[in-house]
Amino acid sequence: IYQLSDNGTMAVVLPHGVLFRGASEGTIREYLIKEKNYLDAVIGLPANIFFGTSIPTCILVFKKCRENEDNILFIDASKDFEPGKNQNRLRDDDVNKIIETYKSRVEKPKYCHVAPLSEIAENEYNLNIPRYVDTFEEEEEIDIKVVQQDLKRIDKEIAEVDKELNVYLKELGLEEI
């Protein structure tokens, strides 16, 4: 970052751990955000897109001359990829979606969030993406009455199969179940 010109932009690919680990990494995050305000965006990438490692990675975008000084953009692109046998791949559409989201800085539910610096301070400079981008999916409600009916039907089918099986076992001279 020191080598970056005053109007330069730098993007760094790192493992997700740098977003939330404590100790010196936490101190560095706080310094880069609170003291210098260089961090412009955090982009979460899918796991297994880089050769030789399956860990999820992220891109940190730094700018010394930020246009949006009061917030940081969080993008969760971890679900947008083409699965591969040995390695996952970002498609052109996936990359374009990231770029367009970065340029527009518009909130998209379950994909990106523009977090004010106060929110990041409240989270003690922990940049873990799920703290900022809610990706929780509601589970479908289970109708207990339907499940009970299914269980009764299945029990009845099992009883019929057992009855038929006992006929065959009896014919073979074997003990019934």
Protein language model regions, located:
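A conserved structural/catalytic subdomain of Rossmann-like adenosyl-cofactor enzymes
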Residues: 1-177
